[in-house]
Amino acid sequence: MVVIALWGCETDSSDIDKKVREVASAFAEAYFNYDFEEALKWVTDDSEKWLRFAATNISQEDVDSLNAQMKAATVEIGEVSYIDDNTLTVGITVEDFLLKDTLGKPGHIEDEAEYNLTVVKQGKKYLVRMACLPQNERRSHD
């Protein structure tokens, strides 16, 4: 009887992990390819302001760089960590994307960067919660 109960919990955890990975992937693919309308579908209501902020800081030079890019940004989902019952952190690696790291200056194509996304449970859905724009985790450790 105990084995069945443990197996049931593992399945629930596995299902949650899968859902969280899907949400993080959908958000990151949209966000790092500058499809903010699509990214908006995968974030909490209070995160919308950060997507709007990012969208209003794109210059014509950035648009030209995005249009000249030969391939879309790619995202690899890494480790999922539980913070509490309703909050998780998802590590992602993003490749070949336009990095905007200084306001008022054009972005540049970045080969690879690592980010952590916070995913929260709201009702029956999991959504990305942005407290700020995503920050490159590698850069902060240099």
Name each model feature, range by range:
Residues 16-17, 64-68, 103-107:
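Intrinsically disordered, low-complexity segments enriched in polar/charged residues with Gly/Pro
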Residues 21, 36-98:
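Short solvent-exposed beta->alpha transition segments
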Residues 7-33, 41:
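Short, low-complexity N-terminal intrinsically disordered segments enriched in polar/charged residues
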Residues 1-7:
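Sec-dependent bacterial lipoprotein signal peptides
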Residues 81-142:
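Exposed beta-sheet edge and beta->alpha loop/turn motif
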